[in-house]
């Protein structure tokens, strides 16, 4: 919001590629603060007001426009957004968790589809990539939803932006290395169980959540040392240490859990 104001711009739409599992996206709070509608692609069934776009639908933003590409596979509602410049030429694509740099999004088992197996999701993803993304122009700029370190993929490149031309060479999903059968096997073999909080995040992103400001207001309250000592007598209390790993190693409170927030988020 601050960046938009500094540039004299208005946030017109909030585009969601899918129901995220690894974080709460903040889309509802942003929509409330800006009056911008939330956009999802086909198959999304949120419990709040939004626009469910059709595959191929365009949204105009000033002199540019964005085309919705339904690219299921990571999830059934996953989509990518193709940006056209002022000359009506494809300029960039925002691929969410469908296509990463050097990798693709693994089937999102956190959503636990009743009628769709991980193998079927991988097969659908193969079709999405080969029919919707691979045919696009080589000079297209690719902006994926994650960089290296995310649990939504396995072998992502450390870079966060690339051209589709480079990905057609360096990404196994685009360079013809695998046929569909081998692709499905590669993507689903030894697939790890998702972190325990993933299904909760999916539900929050789909059904709604408490505003972040309210969460902070309720949670970020100072306590003195005596109050702290009393609180930790309760076995249900969990202590999270968010300092650097260096500081945690030097000393930490007994039984505290290290989750250092050092500015690097995948």
Where do the language-model regions lie?
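Active-site HxH/HxHxD metal-binding segment of metal-dependent hydrolases
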Residues: 1-70, 84, 89-91
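Metallo-beta-lactamase
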Residues: 65, 75-193
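Conserved beta-strand elements of the Class I
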Residues: 67, 93, 238-240
């Amino acid at each position: 919001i601050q960046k938009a104001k500094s540039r004299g711009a208005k946030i017109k739409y909030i585009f969601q590629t899918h129901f995220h599992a690894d974080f709460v996206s903040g889309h509802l709070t942003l929509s409330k603060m800006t009056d911008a509608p939330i956009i999802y692609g086909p198959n999304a069934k949120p419990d709040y007001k939004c626009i469910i776009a059709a595959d191929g639908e365009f949204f105009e933003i000033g002199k540019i426009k964005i085309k919705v590409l339904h690219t299921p596979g990571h999830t059934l509602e996953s989509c990518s957004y193709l940006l056209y410049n002022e000359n009506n030429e494809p300029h960039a694509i925002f691929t969410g968790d469908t296509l990463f740099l050097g990798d693709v999004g693994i089937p999102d088992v956190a959503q636990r589809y009743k009628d769709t197996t991980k193998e079927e999701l991988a097969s659908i993803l193969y079709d999405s990539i080969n029919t919707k993304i691979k045919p696009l122009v080589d000079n297209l700029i690719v902006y994926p939803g994650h960089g290296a370190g995310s649990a939504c993929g396995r072998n992502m490149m450390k870079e966060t932006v690339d051209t589709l031309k480079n990905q057609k060479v360096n990404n196994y999903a685009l360079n013809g290395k695998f046929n569909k059968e081998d692709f499905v096997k590669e993507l689903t073999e030894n697939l790890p169980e998702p972190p325990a909080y993933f299904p909760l995040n999916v539900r929050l992103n789909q059904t709604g959540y408490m505003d972040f400001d309210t969460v902070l207001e309720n949670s970020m309250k100072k306590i003195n040392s005596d109050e702290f000592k009393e609180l930790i007598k309760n076995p249900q209390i969990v202590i999270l240490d968010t300092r650097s790993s260096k500081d945690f190693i030097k000393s930490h409170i007994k039984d505290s859990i290290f989750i250092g927030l050092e500015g690097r988020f995948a």
